[in-house]
């Protein structure tokens, strides 16, 4: 286990580049967001993107990593299988997993977002998500890259959704990107958050660590989703 940080979070913190932020923070690993066009942020120049679909872009990223003693802990994907372009998203995700394999990156964070899931219900969202993520796994079965669904949003923080997807897909390569703050953000009482974490611990492939400092009298209450997050969020 080792500590890394999101590329976007480093820049949000005011650092002039990802590499500069990593050095100041004493961290040598970064989680990198891959955009829909297969570009990623340069680690040394935030105004520059590297195209991972081209040999030149891939080489440029590898050079930055080697020259600065940095490794990529995971790729991050912002997929949404509720959109009309799910087929194109699967292709993008497959390409990303294959690049991850080529670079020796062991994990890819995938999103639990399914826009409009309310109109098809949780069961419909489970079927839709499972169908698409199965395609990604099957198309990359010659790799050992692990996919971690982040417990994110109004759907992904429902344990019944996550459990049903894992059972429907039944792949050892599919698990959880455990966000330690999101189950709490969703409104689960603190003791329930710990129960959920224990339940899914064997499925964890990757983690996002953050905290919310609700006052003691609110910690065991079932709260509305996202209740006063801006007030109580507590950066670690």
Residue ranges and their predicted role:
Residues 36, 81, 114, 190, ...:
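Flexible, active-site-proximal loop/turn residues at the rims of small-molecule/cofactor binding pockets
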Residues 16-17, 21-23, 58-74, 81-176, ...:
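Active-site acidic/histidine proton-transfer and metal-coordination neighborhood
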Residues 45, 80, 84, 116-121, ...:
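Short coil/turn segments at secondary-structure junctions
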Residues 34, 79, 112, 204, ...:
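Residues that line or immediately flank small-molecule/substrate-binding pockets and catalytic motifs
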Residues 9, 46-52, 78-87, 233-236:
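The substrate-binding groove and active-site-proximal loops of carbohydrate-active enzymes
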Residues 2, 7, 13, 30, ...:
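Acidic/histidine-rich catalytic cores of soluble enzymes
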Residues 31-60, 113-118:
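Glycine-rich, proline-tolerant flexible connector loops at the mouths of alpha/beta enzymes
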Residues 3, 21-27:
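A short, Lys/Arg-enriched amphipathic alpha-helix followed by its capping loop at the start of a domain
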